[in-house]
Amino acid sequence: MWKQVEFELQSRRRGFHLITGEILRNLPPLPKVGLLHLFIKHTSAGLSINENADPDVRVDMESIFNHLVKEREPYYQHTLEGDDDMPAHAKSSIIGTSITIPITNGKLNLGTWQGIYLCEFRDYGGNRRVVATISGE
């Protein structure tokens, strides 16, 4: 069995945002066993799985990525879309645009402290589109 849905996430400011609930609300019923693949259709945002309990983790992740990839570097050629755009492309490539999660007994088989993150790398990224592909039985 294969299912695929595409949906829009609400607009968020730059940062790492826990979106597990929003993802689940947009999915059709899940099979008993299978895989959920999520793909974000943008080049300046990403998806990740990380801690869902302490919000300081999300703040720290933002700080780490801003330290790794700085804005306004003199060697950036792609600068027409703002100071945050080229760094957003680099951060998206580092973190990735897709994740895969196992489905067990009709539920996402995430660890106790795991949640799905939208990694928004633009100051004002706008609405983001996600393709969810479900396989299983």
Task: Give the predicted meaning of each segment.
Residues M1-E137:
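Active-site histidine-anchored catalytic micro-motif
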